[in-house]
A protein has these predicted regions:
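Transmembrane beta-strands of outer-membrane beta-barrel pores
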Residues: 50-54, 72, 83-87, 119-123, ...
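Outer-membrane beta-barrel "beta-signal"
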Residues: 224, 250-264
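Transmembrane beta-strand segments of Gram-negative outer membrane beta-barrel proteins
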Residues: 37-52, 75-79
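Transmembrane beta-barrel strands of outer-membrane/channel proteins
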Residues: 48-50, 79-85, 101, 115-119, ...
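Residues that define the transmembrane beta-barrel architecture of outer-membrane proteins
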Residues: 42, 58-62, 93-97, 129-133, ...
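Repeated loop/turn-to-beta-strand initiation elements of outer-membrane beta-barrel proteins
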Residues: 42, 74-79, 110-113, 145-149, ...
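Solvent-exposed loop/turn segments connecting transmembrane beta-strands
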Residues: 52-60, 88-94, 121-128, 145, ...
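Outer-membrane beta-barrel transmembrane domain signature
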Residues: 146-228
Length: 264
């Protein structure tokens, strides 16, 4: 899987062009999402990718992720784990880990409540870890056999712990916590019998005097090769208005790979 390090574009123009074309060809495209059914069964997928180069260029990239989800008539729970590593000319350009747990309970056909928790580490960005939790309300705008689109809003709390103390909110800090709003939208699309797309956009305005802002956008396109194997291309953007000294505010990635459906 390819990754774009903060502030840099991929060294494979053909791959980037192909991925962009795929993304632009769809109405709205994170890593491949599990397609659940309200039958109470757990479904799991495993994804991986790697690339290596030696000679004039010395490159290595590895990515792995695991997802599990269970849905009933009234609630849905999901788990996700992801690890990403990339190096160029013997210098690490990406090294992060992400763990998530999400829960949703339907109040009726349109309205639901949600809760989620996230643990995120990004060594390149001096982030030892970020712990986040949020809860709120969502509204299902549309639901069809091929498309669904929802809006959600809530409140949560995030705490960042830094590997090296850095200046955040005008002070030298080892850790930084704040209450945040959670405002977002998410959609899934069945484009063809073998092609699915998903996108999720979330804003996190802080409820403090510093008015910090975070935003995350993730989108993916998945094309099934067999009943269990699929090719995926995904793009991710993370924005932090105050990430600390000598850290880019915007982090972006392009990732390609394969996923394997462990259970159906």
């Amino acid at each position: 899987m390819k990754t774009i390090a903060p502030g840099h574009f991929t060294t494979r123009p053909a791959l980037a062009a192909l991925a962009c074309a795929l993304l632009l060809a769809t109405p709205a495209l994170t890593q491949a999402q599990i397609k659940t059914q309200p039958d109470g069964r757990w479904r799991q997928i495993l994804g991986a990718g790697a690339s290596f180069a030696d000679g004039n260029s010395n490159l290595s990239s590895m990515n792995a992720h695991y997802e599990a989800a269970r849905q009933t008539r009234h609630h849905t729970v999901g788990l996700r784990a992801q690890a990403l590593y990339n190096s160029s000319d013997h210098k690490t350009s990406a090294h992060n880990t992400n763990l998530e747990i999400n829960g949703k309970r339907n109040l009726n056909e349109r309205h639901y409540i949600f809760a989620n928790g996230t643990w995120f580490r990004d060594r390149i960005a001096n982030l030892e870890h970020r712990l986040s939790a949020a809860t709120g309300w969502g509204y299902q705008v549309t639901t069809t056999p091929h498309d669904d689109w929802s809006l959600f809003a809530g409140i949560g709390y995030s705490e960042d712990r830094y590997a090296v103390p850095t200046i955040v909110a005008d002070q030298l800090r080892k850790r930084y916590g704040r209450a945040e709003l959670t405002l977002g939208t998410e959609s899934h699309h069945q484009l063809t019998a073998t092609t699915t797309a998903h996108q999720r956009l979330v804003f996190y305005p802080a409820l403090n005097r510093n008015h910090d802002r975070r935003a995350e956008f993730a989108a993916d396109l998945s094309v099934s090769i067999t009943e269990r194997l699929a090719l995926t291309v995904a793009t991710e953007f993370r924005y932090n208005s105050d990430p600390g000294t000598n850290v880019h505010k915007l982090d972006r990635r392009l990732i390609t790979g394969v996923t394997w459906k462990l259970t159906d």
